């Protein structure tokens, strides 16, 4: 999704489920993309002809990097790699993981853009696009336009969840999402605020919001 679209709330809800763990805001996908870029001489077209041996190697390296962030892998769990702007790499991800499932968090564009602009993000290459309102709006439009292209070009497996629907119809939205993940309902997701309390720290700008009751203003 896009920053400030409810991704941290969704992260906390999902990690409350006993069969889910969320690996938050790591660079594993970016490293995957860099590996693909090097092999294809930075040509998106050449990505299509990368051989199976290279794909297996990148896949293995990705998992090694991703699981380095957890204490012990539980093969019974589903692990979600959560970084909102990974949405721009859907094409590359599908080249390595053609059966990947994507959860796309959405929110009304005006709320999303204004919230990003007003947020005091830690500055990096991505967050530098939010230093003024115009650039923030342009960035949002570019990324959502890219998502539309991906939907047209690729027949990939995704689930969209809208922040506004989540807070107004929590149970149904989360049940549908769990169905998408082939997981049963578990009442622990209703107590996501307890999960937030137990976490050492939530490393996103929303850390003080997910422990509160659901609300539409953020």
Annotate each language-model stretch with its function.
Residues 27-29, 109-112, 166-167:
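Conserved nucleotide-binding/hydrolysis micro-motifs of P-loop NTPases
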């Amino acid at each position: 999704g896009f920053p400030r679209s409810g991704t941290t709330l969704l992260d906390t809800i999902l990690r409350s489920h006993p069969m889910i763990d969320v690996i938050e805001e790591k660079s594993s996908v970016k490293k995957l993309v860099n590996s693909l870029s090097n092999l294809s001489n930075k040509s998106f077209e050449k990505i299509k002809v990368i051989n199976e041996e290279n794909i297996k190697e990148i896949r293995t390296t990705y998992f090694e990097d991703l699981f380095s962030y957890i204490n012990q892998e539980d093969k019974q769990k589903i692990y979600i790699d959560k970084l909102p702007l990974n949405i721009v790499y859907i094409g590359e991800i599908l080249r390595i993981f053609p059966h990947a499932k994507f959860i796309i968090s959405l929110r009304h564009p005006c709320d999303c853009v204004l919230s990003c602009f007003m947020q005091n993000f830690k500055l990096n290459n991505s967050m530098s696009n939010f230093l003024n309102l115009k650039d923030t709006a342009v960035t949002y439009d570019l990324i959502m336009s890219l998502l539309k292209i991906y939907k047209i070009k690729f027949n990939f497996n995704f689930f969209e969840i809208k922040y506004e629907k989540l807070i107004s119809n929590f149970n149904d939205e989360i049940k549908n999402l769990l169905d998408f993940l082939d997981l049963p309902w578990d009442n622990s997701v209703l107590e996501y605020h307890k999960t937030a309390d137990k976490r050492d720290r939530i490393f996103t700008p929303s850390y003080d919001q997910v422990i509160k009751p659901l609300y539409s203003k953020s």
